[in-house]
């Protein structure tokens, strides 16, 4: 079972996405902010899903940069899917090292398919 760290400050989104991914066989650790995501990374993960816009001034792209720069306990090459309701954030996410970028709202099946492709190689 692949372990996914889901970083999103919207509790409704987090609950829905977690349940749907769990139904598809993923283990999901939901984190509402960057600090909790960094702590969760220390317990191992196979991929991250990070919202670009988090509460309290947190920026998901900054979390992505810290992962890629080895400033967390996560593997710097771990797959990271960035999400945002603002499609203009995609370029910044890509430049920061996002593996994929999804514009909200997206279908749950799309997210599960993207994760499977990244983790299973196809």
Where do the protein language model's features map onto the residues?
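Short amphipathic alpha-helix used as the core "switch/output" element in two-component signaling
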Residues: 59-75
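Acidic, metal-coordinating helix/loop segments flanking the phosphotransfer/catalytic sites
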Residues: 30-47, 55
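Alpha4 helix (beta4-alpha4-beta5 surface) of REC/receiver domains from two-component response regulators
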Residues: 62, 85-103
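Short acidic/polar segment at the start of the alpha1 helix of CheY-like receiver
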Residues: 10-14, 56, 89
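His-Asp phosphorelay/catalytic-motif detector in bacterial-type signaling
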Residues: 46, 72-79
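Hydrophobic/aromatic residues positioned on beta-strands within the core alpha/beta folds
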Residues: 81-83
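Two-component/phosphorelay signaling modules centered on CheY-like receiver
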Residues: 11-29
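C-terminal output helix
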Residues: 106-115
């Amino acid at each position: 079972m692949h372990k996914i760290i889901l970083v999103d400050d919207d509790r409704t989104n987090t609950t829905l996405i977690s349940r749907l991914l769990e139904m598809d066989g993923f283990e999901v650790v939901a984190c509402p902010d960057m600090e909790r995501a960094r702590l969760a990374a220390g317990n191992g993960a196979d991929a991250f899903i990070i919202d670009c816009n988090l509460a309290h001034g947190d920026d998901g792209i900054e979390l992505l940069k810290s992962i890629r720069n080895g400033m967390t306990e996560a593997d710097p090459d771990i797959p990271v899917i960035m999400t945002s309701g603002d499609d203009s954030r995609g370029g910044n996410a890509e430049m920061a090292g996002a593996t994929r970028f999804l514009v909200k709202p997206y279908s749950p099946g799309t997210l599960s398919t993207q994760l499977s492709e990244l983790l299973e190689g196809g």
